[in-house]
Amino acid sequence: MLPESVFLLLISHFLRAVTQPPFETEGVKQKLFHFSGHIDDFIVSRDQQTIYVASLNRLTSLSISNFSIQHEVSLGPVQDSPWCSADGKSCLKDNRPFPTDVRTKILQILPTNQILQCGSVKLGSCSTFNSKLSLITESTIAVAANSPDASTVSKIIDNRLIVAASATKESPYRDPFPAVAIRNLPGLNVENAGDLEGEAAVFLRAAYKNAFKFLYTFTHQHFVFVVAMVTPRESRLPMTTRLIRFCRNDTKFESYSEIELQCRGEDNTNYPFLNAIIQSYDKLIASFSTSSTSPKSSICVFSMQKVKLTFWYNVDRCRSGTDSIRLPHIGRDTKCVNKAHIPLDEDSCELGVGGSIELVEMSTKDIMGKVTSLMAVDQKAIFAGTTTSQIVMFKWDEHHSNQLEEYGRKEVGDGRTGSEVSKMVKFGDFVIVQMPYGIILEELSTCSHHSSCTECLVSVDPLCQWCHPTQSCTTSARCTSPVTSQCPIVDGDPIPSIVSVNSSTPISFNIHHLPPPVGFTYRCQFGTSTSSIKANWTTTGVSCPSEIFTSPNTFEILLLTSISNNPISRHNFTVYDCSGYGTCSSCMSSEYNCAWCSGLHKCSNSCGALEKSKACVKIQPMRLPIAIGSQQEIVLEASNLDTLDRRHEHFCKVNEQVSLAKIASDSIRCGKIQLTLSNTTSANMVVPLSLITRDSVIDIANVSLYSCTNLASDCSSCLALSPSLSCGWCNRQCSHECHESKATAVCDPPRIDKFEPTSGPIEGGTIIKIYGNDLGMSVEDVRGKIYVAGSRCNIVEYHVSNMIACQVDKGVSSGPIRISVGRATVAVAESSELYSFVRTSIFSAYPLYGPISGGTRITLYGQNLSSGSQTSVTVGGMPCPIERVNSSTVLTCLTPSGTRIGKSARVVVHVDHSQTQLDQPFEYRSDPSISSIFPMTSFKAGGRIVYVQGNSLNTVQTAKLFLISSPTPPFYIISDLAPCHIINSTLMTCMTPKILETITRRVEYTRQPVGFHMDNVTAVANLGRRIQMGIYPNPTLSPFKGVRYHQGEQSLILEGHNLNLAAEPNDFKIFIGNERCYVTLVDVRQLVCSGPVRQPKATDERGIPINGDNPLVTVIVGSLRMELGLIEYSDHALPSRLSLLILGLLLFIVVTLTVMCLVFKRRRQEREKEYRKIQLQMENLENNVRKECKQAFAELQTNLVLSPKSANSVNLGPELINFPHFVENLLWSDNNLTSAPSLARTLPVTLAQFHALLSFKGFIFTIVEAAESDVSISTSEKSMLASLLISVLLRNFSYCTEVVVDLLRAHIARSVQNKRAELLFRNSDSVVEKMFSKWMSICLYSHLTPQMNSYFYLYKALQYQTDKGPVDAVTGDARYTINEAKLLRESVDTKTLKIRVIPFEKCDESIDLEVHACDAICQVKQKVASAVYRETPYSQRPRITQFELKYKCPKRGDVKLTDVLPIETLSQKKLPVKLFTLADYGISDGCTLEMSPAVYTAESYRNSLADSGQSSWSSLDRCSPIYSSSKYYHLTNPSSGTMTFKKKSSNDSNLLPKSIPEVYLTRLLTSKGTVETYVEDFLESVLYMHDSSYPPILKFFFDILDREASVNGVSENICQQWKANGYVLRVWANFVRNPQLVFDVPHSISMDANLSTVAQTMMDCFSFSEPVLGAHSPSSRLLFAKDVARLRPLSVDLFKRVKNSPPLGMDELRTELVNMANDVSTCKGSSLALSELLSWVRGNGIRISQLLSSNEQFSQQRLPQKLSQVLHVCLETDNHIYSTISDYE
């Protein structure tokens, strides 16, 4: 059996085809940049020079070359609230903006190379920046999620932005907000927004808004995909992963579809939680886990072809009428309709479904750790980032296209960057890694470590390719030429590889797979020369001319490329010189192409034809040797002697001795020469003999010499030499001079010096070797004459004179060895030492069992086991190779393999001819097997304890663990052998082995198969892929910097790297001195242990004392031992440092008291100075308050009536619009119906059929029911539907009235049934109530002339009162207003100016006009337009953007008046910027202004926009531009001194406000007193206080409510609430708040505030609950509290009067309806409305058809069939998913 060392050697060399370790990695350069705030996202610029990083409140650009900041801009914090508008001007009740951090949700590079950034503030709106991060535009459109924790994904495709965002706080300023949308760039509006036929967006229903979390979006072919995780509505159900798909050009989202992705394990375990996902070419790679906190991740690979087919299967099922659409969260969950007539393929964009067929894949790889990001590297590798600062690298399995094989890991970041790898982006040969607080640039591959093409191509790194021009291993991206997949193969040596000096011959290299030179050249370099020669490439290799060499040499010839110094091949190259051969024979017999030039008598490679010798004299070596010291003639045979010139004498020369040579025909006879050599100890040697003539050497031959003295040292050896040597023995030495006395020589007696062995078994058979002198001259001299202790010994080996080996026969005693030498004369030699015959025996053996495979080391105990010459052991008749013989009583052997388990085998010891059997047999048992190892991780240094489970483990006595290179042959050992401890048959513990440094080089991570050395059991020598151990980098701990101070009762925290990758807390042994510190926590970079409370002695872990008083901290993990440094306990150091501490404390107290005194003195001076300053400011505040109070008192006493001029302005009469215009405003003011694409595509006959269908009330009721029951329909859509129905029904007003009344009755009954009776007409969130309010407004319009007159006078009075004082052009705040929210709380100079205006239409006339010096230019232009076009209706007046004002300045000429400076100048100013006023231009009383037409240029266009957010000329046709309050102000500066709720800086110079806001509340009384009469008149007219008659339709409406209240059992109070809400809230409040419905007047922010107060007062008058008013009540309610209290009883009286009035007769009602029908007949747009209504019905056709079919009465009227017929006609011209309606029988 083989010993262990041989076993390891064989395994290490087993099939050595693999010549390198399976995984190699090289340290990579890393660039890192830290951020103070959390990083949200990053992108790389298109020029690959800059990284744009969005972090908390910042946007930064980094230079990739040096990772330094180029530009940076601050994004926040900003004043924001989700309950406020984007500009912060309006908020919901009790909400105010507050400082909010900005978290970037979208970061993209636009096609214009601008940066698009969308944050979590301002409703998720976006901004654009240029490359230097200067702000370009700000949008107010909500695009991203406006919550830090909500998800948003985006992608730019075809100049469009794909956005998927999770729902956040339900703010009315964001609703409706799409979950997935396509937005146009740069406007960011949703494509086809508002189109009734569909828009490029989907909206989640309220119940599902918080269910979707979007993770990733990508494109594949012509589809867009979005990946989302969906939380089920039922908590018991698991989360699901949904893959959303729609076509790139689908602007209506008809193709919107979803499928479920599932990743399952081998045991069918579902992994529902998606951690990361990436799409790469035709694969979708995703990482899943069982939960969000699971430490294990599983990777699944989905084929994009399977994804496409799964979508197709689901769509095809729905197309065939199977299943339902299954998209309830977006309002599409109706049953699928058979549409088999529609062609469908895998790329179809016509249908979209949710589907019930999911896509399931099995897990391809499991990772211990949570994967947070994925990145694909071409089609070769996948990188997975984890939460532990690691990047796990995978490559695609060569045999299974969807299988991943891990080939390495990288650790990135440091302690400051955080540990989660959030995002990875490939950047050339690098990867940019985003971590929570850092951006890292890391190398992708480890190719630079491989130096040869073969190593590169067999490397486990799939990114490594061999770049031929540079002769380096790199990635394909770095190589200028195509990388090669085959290494060049050099076929033999270059031709020629040998050249002569002074010659030049082209040298050819035969190389296979040598690519042609593209972008480089091949070059040849000879030896160490720095220059090279260009080589010519051919299909078979290259050739290059050689240099001309002047001296012989052997060197390397290198084949290089022109851009690399790494040789492609290297060969030995020889330059020879024939002239170095001095004789003709040596010249002619040389291995080079040399010839002998006889004429020149020299050797050359180029002799002339006549000079070249054809034959040379060749002396043959001498056959018989010559004795050294003899003198004799030497005869040598030779050939070609006839070529010699016999006219000259020839001589022989040996060792500088010369003798005359006689030349015969075939021999040379040299005269006698004395052959002597001094100081030689060699028995034989060779010396050269030269044949010379005339100082030239003809040839040289070797002559053999010998020395008899050195050939034999004793007499017998000398006489036994060959007679030809003529050696003889005399004078006690062997010499050729004794040849004559050889026959008479007498040798010394034979002598035995020693023999071995000295004992043997009595059975004989022992071979004894006897050493001595003169033991005969031949074997015959001693044959049969050797006796050992009296027993014959037969010769088996004989060496003349000095050694005899013989085999002894049986014997029983001890005695010497006798040898008789000689034949004629006998001499006897006898040994002085005795040989003993002994008896061998075996007593016992251990162990007596072992594995069937053999190899058990069995130890035998007995007697005389070391005797004899040959010892062997057999077990069961098979050899048991002896490992060692420890002594004569112990020997060890390795058992052979057995034939059957459980078989007993005899153990026999053979010593020569002796056989001894052991009494106990040896038992063969089952081979051990390994089932599992735990844990399966270790580090390079090894030494970690692992537990091995298996069967029959105790069959062997020892086991050793090692790692091998490959799970399949060929493989070799890559570690040392680690010992194991066998506990029982199923369990043993092993230490993990140390990885050999020569193998690993710098391995960071690898998984290696495991093997065990367990006797001869080969089944466990390689456990294959089943059990592989992960090898991690060694854990390292940072040494202490100096002495570490520690509190004894606290835990000791140690910092390091790779601590928990392959180690648990129990693997670490931490010693403080010689006492343990027990580990409680291990993190990847931190180790926490609990040690002794008191400081141990100053020793190491072994208790060996060290210098100093502090103990040493030592950490032992596995075979690693780390000394971190000394530690000192704080309480231990206290006594020695107490005195210094007290002294320092006293010094500190003295210094502190001194400083405090100085500071106190200075603070006191500052406080006195501050007090004087505040006192002065308080006096200014008192003066301002006093001034404001006096002015307010004066206004209260003097301004309570309108001036005559104002009265004229009021008495102009109401500017009522005509009835058709009123109806158009009423129906479409909130709903744009300017165009209808569907009308052009709809056939007239279809519209006629549809209109006929509307003549059935049941059909209209069904439409309303479908809308009311659909929770996904928004309020605006309901309003649009109500307007469409009213517009269509106005063709027949009587029928319209019947429909509205019937719907109202049903609605009242339903509200009462649902216990919502008191809410009727209050919220108006139903289609019925909206239809009623529009119908009621139309009916009352012609009867409201008195009320409209009062309302118009009130409007003019409010307008005059507001314009009498300054109005802020930005905020709308006015000095004179009745709305507290819009009260101007500033002291503004109200100087009135009288100016002259020259209109551009009447240049010779001027108009006098009163304005305020503080008026902005846009306000002046409004007043000018109102004065000049006083008698022109407002809608026909020119807009203020259509003319300009020029100031006729006598000194400066004409000065153009504008609100702001040009954009270029404005951008350099500090924001906010004040709007210019007349005072700023120096305009005073009597100045002249001239109107001129506006000239539109690019600059003026930008100026006119004035950062208003307006994007078209039409939007500028308002009464005034809308200026952003964040950038502009007029009268109220945001940082002004008025005491507001804004917190001021402590170092602000104006610590106190200029005034108190409450002081200005008296202006409300002034304004109220002025307009009070008009308000009362209007309210009384609404209450019909002065009229005895009422509109018939009002009586009709009230009677209906009374009847329905009686029928449904509703109380009188609730009925009166119905009347008040229906009459006031739904009709009059709408008129008051929107005067543009009835008057041709402009829109104004300040007027809107005033009218809101009037509307609130009117509603308070009709309120039936007594309000509780106090100091904290809104001022607007307190203003008219007395009037409300007076008028509230009159509202009740109004209802009673109407109720008690005579009932409305049918004739009177019919007349009223006929009159209304005549009025509405002039209205237009019903065809357009009919077409839009048809489009809506088509979109909800399935639901409507189902409702119609469920009603028996409607089915009898065949309404479902009629609807189906209409919609089928529509399908021929416009076919999409919402139109899939079939007949419902």
UniProtKB/Swiss-Prot annotation:
Biological process terms in GO annotation: axonal fasciculation; embryo development ending in birth or egg hatching; motor neuron axon guidance; negative regulation of cell adhesion; nematode larval development; nematode male tail tip morphogenesis; positive regulation of axonogenesis; regulation of axon guidance
Main localization (coarse): membrane
Disulfide bonds: C84-C91, C118-C126, C247-C349, C263-C300, C318-C336, C447-C464, C453-C487, C456-C473, C467-C479, C524-C544
Residue ranges constituting the Sema domain according to the UniProt record: 18-444
Topological domains annotated Cytoplasmic: 1161-1785
Residue span(s) of domain IPT/TIG: 750-837, 840-924, 928-1040
Residue span, PSI domain: 446-488, 577-617, 707-748
SMART domains: IPT, PSI, Sema
Extracellular topological intervals: 18-1139
UniProt key word Disulfide bond: yes
Keywords, comma-separated and alphabetical: Cell membrane, Coiled coil, Developmental protein, Differentiation, Disulfide bond, Glycoprotein, Membrane, Neurogenesis, Receptor, Repeat, Signal, Transmembrane, Transmembrane helix
InterPro entries attached to this UniProt entry: Ig-like_fold (IPR013783), Ig_E-set (IPR014756), IPT_dom (IPR002909), Plexin (IPR031148), Plexin_cytoplasmic_RasGAP_dom (IPR013548), Plexin_RBD (IPR046800), Plexin_repeat (IPR002165), PSI (IPR016201)
Gene3D superfamilies according to UniProt: GTPase Activation - p120gap, domain 1, Immunoglobulins, YVTN repeat-like/Quinoprotein amine dehydrogenase
Gene Ontology MF: a single term: semaphorin receptor activity
Tissue: Expressed predominantly in the central nervous system from embryonic to adult stages. Expressed in early embryos in ventral neuroblasts. Expressed in neurons and in a subset of posterior lateral and ventral epidermal cells following epidermal enclosure. Present in neurons, muscles and weakly expressed in epidermal cells of the larval tail.
Residues passing through the membrane, by range: 1140-1160
Glycosylation positions in this chain: N66, N249, N502, N536, N572, N679, N702, N864, N886, N984, N1016
CDD domains xrefs: IPT_plexin_repeat1 (cd01180), IPT_plexin_repeat2 (cd01179), RasGAP_plexin (cd12205)
Topology versus the membrane: Single-pass type I membrane protein
A UniProt-annotated Pfam family: Plexin_cytopl
Summary of subunit composition and partner proteins: Interacts with mab-20.
Family, per entry: Belongs to the plexin family.
Function according to Swiss-Prot or TrEMBL: Involved as a receptor for mab-20/sema-2a in the formation or stabilization of cell-cell contacts at several stages of epithelial morphogenesis. In early embryonic development, required for proper ventral closure of the epidermis. During male tail morphogenesis, involved in precursor cell sorting and in the formation of distinct sensory rays. Involved in axon guidance of SDQL neurons during neurogenesis. Probably in response to stimulation by mab-20, regulates fln-1-mediated remodeling of the actin cytoskeleton and thus axon guidance and/or fasciculation of DD/VD neurons.
Name used for this protein in its record: Plexin-2
